[in-house]
UniProtKB/Swiss-Prot annotation:
This is Serine hydroxymethyltransferase. It is an enzyme of class 2 (transferase). Pfam families: SHMT. GO terms for cellular component: cytosol. The keyword Cytoplasm applies. Pathway: One-carbon metabolism; tetrahydrofolate interconversion; Amino-acid biosynthesis; glycine biosynthesis; glycine from L-serine: step 1/1. The lineage of its organism: Bacteria, Pseudomonadati, Bacteroidota, Flavobacteriia, Flavobacteriales. Catalyzes the reversible interconversion of serine and glycine with tetrahydrofolate (THF) serving as the one-carbon carrier. This reaction serves as the major source of one-carbon groups required for the biosynthesis of purines, thymidylate, methionine, and other important biomolecules. Also exhibits THF-independent aldolase activity toward beta-hydroxyamino acids, producing glycine and aldehydes, via a retro-aldol mechanism. It comes from Flavobacterium psychrophilum (strain ATCC 49511 / DSM 21280 / CIP 103535 / JIP02/86). InterPro entries: PyrdxlP-dep_Trfase (IPR015424), PyrdxlP-dep_Trfase_major (IPR015421), PyrdxlP-dep_Trfase_small (IPR015422), Ser_HO-MeTrfase (IPR001085), Ser_HO-MeTrfase-like (IPR049943), Ser_HO-MeTrfase_PLP_BS (IPR019798), SHMT-like_dom (IPR039429). PROSITE patterns: SHMT. SUPFAM superfamilies: PLP-dependent transferases (SSF53383). It catalyses: (6R)-5,10-methylene-5,6,7,8-tetrahydrofolate + glycine + H2O = (6S)-5,6,7,8-tetrahydrofolate + L-serine. It comes from the Bacteria. Keywords: Amino-acid biosynthesis, Cytoplasm, One-carbon metabolism, Pyridoxal phosphate, Transferase.
Length: 424
């Protein structure tokens, strides 16, 4: 068979882009060689509908062992009693939890997308906002932070069946214990979506949802530094609160309800090559080396935020507790879209992002989101954050000057071009 030169040339082009640029998208990271090797292995050939020991296909003896290792490592990493490693993505994990816990039309309470939430937390363009009745909490105009008393007021008024504690562009830690008190006060299931800070949470660097939330979902990339995929967990299994029973008349455990919601409820065959890569990534995350990495991600983010503030950039909430920051650019007279496009020309990748109380459309936005997981994987430290922010500032202040953009691109290439992708 002829090699598909067109595609493989483009793969090399993308590899060169990643090597020579500064990757600051908060949801992106670089995986290790062994994670990539597992993801590209012969396991992609195997169909394995069902769960370990209970498959609908023969020949699953090996993938059963691999999937069970992934499950056990996920439980060890987060201190969970239950883990399902089959969701193809974080969105699929959330879809499965919603289907397990809700009926169409039920009320949910999530973080407003325009304030830092995620599409799957009730956005009207997403399944979560179409199948269910979404209500929202957001940040305070003065502080850019959550006000838990107001969240309680909203929950009391709206009486949601499910509350989602999680975000995609919120730079502060979340009080999961307070969220649980709010959920209990209205009889709601509490789901934490920790897709962004999962790696930091796993190593004890941020508040732990496991003791407080009924169900936890996450992606397996981002700060966990694994393949693109999803994960569902529970700190403790419990009897489903809706009285669903087995054919023998016993109350189904929530673990069984969730498993059934993933397969056959929302997915068919699991991606066993990706599950193997998840297992490898979980194994890496269990090490002391990963703890040092996660700490450095956090240190780099704090150093970067301080450097932005020093240059009169408005960071929503004034700083960061995790791996990211959301920057309101309105005082710099540039839109998020313009900033993103100019930075790409300078070999710096960020994403435009709405900011709370934004007056621009989601396609233009007033802000950018910036994160440190990927550049930390490449070995950059606190002292490098000042240099990076200086690059960004130079681009933003001269975003229409092609000569300066090229000058910054050359400086970025000099900084990153000889540096390995996976260092830390």
């Amino acid at each position: 068979m002829l090699r598909d030169q067109q595609i493989f040339d483009l793969i090399i082009e993308e590899q060169d882009r990643q090597i020579h640029g500064l990757e600051l998208i908060a949801s992106e990271n670089f995986v290790s060689d062994q994670v990539m090797e597992a993801a590209g292995s012969v396991l992609t050939n195997k169909y394995a509908e069902g769960y370990p020991g209970k498959r609908y296909y023969g020949g699953c003896e090996v993938v059963d062992v691999i999937e069970q290792i992934a499950i056990d490592r996920a439980k060890d990493l987060f201190g969970a009693e239950y883990a399902n490693v089959q969701p193809h993505s974080g969105s699929q994990a959330n879809t499965a939890v919603f289907a397990a816990c809700l009926k169409p039309g039920d009320t949910i309470l999530g973080f407003d997308l325009s304030h830092g939430g995620h599409l799957t937390h009730g956005s009207p363009v997403n399944f979560s906002g179409k199948l269910y009745n979404p209500t929202f909490y957001g940040v305070e105009p003065e502080t850019g932070m959550l006000n838990y008393d107001k969240i309680q007021e909203i929950a009391t008024k709206e009486q949601p069946k499910l509350i989602i504690a999680g975000a995609s562009a919120y730079s502060r830690d979340m009080d999961f214990e307070r969220f649980r008190k709010i959920a209990d006060s209205v009889g709601a299931i509490l789901m934490a979506d920790i897709s962004h800070p999962a790696g930091l949470i796993a190593k004890g660097l941020m508040n732990d949802p496991i003791p407080h939330c009924h169900i936890i979902t996450t992606t397996t990339h981002k700060t966990l530094r694994g393949p693109r995929g999803g994960l569902i967990m529970m700190g403790k299994d419990f009897e489903n609160p809706w009285g669903l029973k087995t054919p023998k008349g016993e109350i189904r455990m929530m673990s069984h309800v969730l498993d059934m919601s993933v397969f056959p409820g929302n997915q068919g065959g699991p991606l066993e090559h990706i599950i193997a890569a998840k297992a490898v990534a979980f194994g890496e995350a269990l090490t002391d080396e990963f703890f040092r990495y996660a700490m450095q991600v956090q240190k780099n983010a704090k150093a970067m935020a301080a450097a932005f503030v020093k240059r009169d950039y408005h960071i929503i909430s004034g700083g960061t507790d995790n791996h990211m920051m959301l920057i309101d650019l309105r005082n710099k007279n540039i839109s998020g879209k313009e900033a993103e496009n100019a930075l790409v020309k300078a070999e710096i990748t960020v994403n435009k992002n709405m900011v709370p109380f934004d007056d621009k459309s989601p396609f233009v936005t007033s802000g950018i989101r910036v994160g440190t997981p990927a550049i930390t994987t490449r070995g950059l430290l606190e002292e490098d954050m000042e240099t990076i922010v200086a690059f960004i500032d130079k681009v933003i202040m001269n975003h229409t000057n092609e000569e300066i953009l090229e000058e910054v691109a050359d400086a970025v290439n000099e900084m990153m071009g000889e540096r390995a992708i996976f260092v830390f």
